[in-house]
Amino acid sequence: MRIAAGVGQNKDVIEAIEKVDFEVFKVESEEELVEYLFNGFADAAIRGSLSASKIMAKLREKYSDKMSRASFIELDGQKFLLAPVGIDEGDDVDQKLLIAEAGSRFLLSLGIKPKIGVLSGGRPQDKGRSKKIDKSIDEGNLLTSILIDRFIDAKHYFILIEDAITDGANFIIAPDGISGNLIFRSIVLLGGGKGHGAVTLGMDEIYIDTSRSNDVEGYKRALEFAHYLVKSSER
């Protein structure tokens, strides 16, 4: 098994590589990282501290716009996926539906039954306060209804993310990618949660996105997540 790790400005990636007990090789350009992933030289890759936008652009040359990222987060012993987290992802119901279905398939592939918590921009009684709030709540209701019709366990928690986590949701769908990115940063970079990287959905290869703000332990967890996914795919 070979895992590629991107090394950019944040050199904590190198220290993380030295802390794991499996083979990881360093890559210093986005083009090389994607090439090694696509030609099979690497069984998985993590972004490390390379450019996310450049890597995603290269990946989309093969996979079009059907890809999205879901962060794997651990908070107070509970583990869950959070998506969308790319600021240009999840802008409408169709995109969020693709993300929800792809993430559900990913969880099922690991033997985990998806339990989706859909979020929106207000409580039910907040409808009428603004067109933006109304649109967000309506989209949350519609997305939840479609998922239930497709036999996926889903509940609309509106703006109450804390209730979704308390209820044991293992896949949180944010109102859009900007909101999801802010939730990720609040939980992982400020709130003491642990980030394990973001799995890229909608592609055959295993690619884990990571934040350039990660520390050594954050990159180490992402490497271990990639290693776990490769081992799981071999079963």
Question: Predicted segment positions?
Answer:
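Anion-binding alpha/beta catalytic cores of soluble intermediary-metabolism enzymes, centered on
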Residues: 1-165, 170, 179-235
